[in-house]
Amino acid sequence: MAGPLRAPLLLLAILAVALAVSPAAGSSPGKPPRLVGGPMDASVEEEGVRRALDFAVGEYNKASNDMYHSRALQVVRARKQIVAGVNYFLDVELGRTTCTKTQPNLDNCPFHDQPHLKRKAFCSFQIYAVPWQGTMTLSKSTCQDA
């Protein structure tokens, strides 16, 4: 009689293991399961995110015809994806500073407060970083006036 019960119990055990290790098993109710290798939220405090942000803003300033530097007012969203390096996806609000492009240090530049010089932009950047090679590439950049 043990023989007829063995097959259903084995199938039940396999099903239980499959459900326990599926990607949906660790997700919270109401949230879609996170895919392995898919984009995930990242903190702006992470060193890699900070470097990617600085790089993207630097590239934005190089490509801009504006005589003033811009810098991040706010990071609206930061995500990262582990691939053969790291893809960073940053949604950033940029503001025009009082520093011209001839000034090297933009960290202490205040934002313009005069209405005719004040300018904001909302940008989405995708940065590909390979930290062990020390390389970063701006893969995608879209900006619009805010």
From Swiss-Prot:
The keyword Chloroplast does not apply. Residues 1-26 form the signal peptide. GO terms for cellular component: cytoplasm; endoplasmic reticulum; endoplasmic reticulum lumen; extracellular exosome; extracellular region; extracellular space; ficolin-1-rich granule lumen; Golgi apparatus. The modification Phosphoserine is found at S43. It is found in: Secreted. The keyword Glycoprotein applies. A motif (Secondary area of contact) lies at residues 81-85. GO terms for biological process: defense response; immune response; negative regulation of blood vessel remodeling; negative regulation of collagen catabolic process; negative regulation of elastin catabolic process; negative regulation of extracellular matrix disassembly; negative regulation of peptidase activity; negative regulation of proteolysis. Disulfide bonds join C99-C109, C123-C143. Keywords: Age-related macular degeneration, Amyloid, Amyloidosis, Disease variant, Disulfide bond, Glycoprotein, Phosphoprotein, Protease inhibitor, Secreted, Signal, Thiol protease inhibitor. One of its GO terms (molecular function) is peptidase inhibitor activity. The record marks G37 as: Reactive site. It comes from the Eukaryota. Its main location: secreted. Homodimer. It is linked to Cerebral amyloid angiopathy, CST3-related: An autosomal dominant disorder characterized by cystatin C amyloid accumulation in the walls of arteries, arterioles, and sometimes capillaries and veins of the brain, and in various organs including lymphoid tissue, spleen, salivary glands, and seminal vesicles. Amyloid deposition in the cerebral vessels results in intracranial hemorrhage and premature stroke. Cystatin C levels in the cerebrospinal fluid are abnormally low. Macular degeneration, age-related, 11: A form of age-related macular degeneration, a multifactorial eye disease and the most common cause of irreversible vision loss in the developed world. In most patients, the disease is manifest as ophthalmoscopically visible yellowish accumulations of protein and lipid that lie beneath the retinal pigment epithelium and within an elastin-containing structure known as Bruch membrane. Belongs to the cystatin family. PANTHER family: CYSTATIN, CYSTATIN-C. Potential cerebrospinal fluid marker for the diagnosis of Creutzfeldt-Jakob disease. As an inhibitor of cysteine proteinases, this protein is thought to serve an important physiological role as a local regulator of this enzyme activity. This is Cystatin-C. It comes from Homo sapiens (Human).
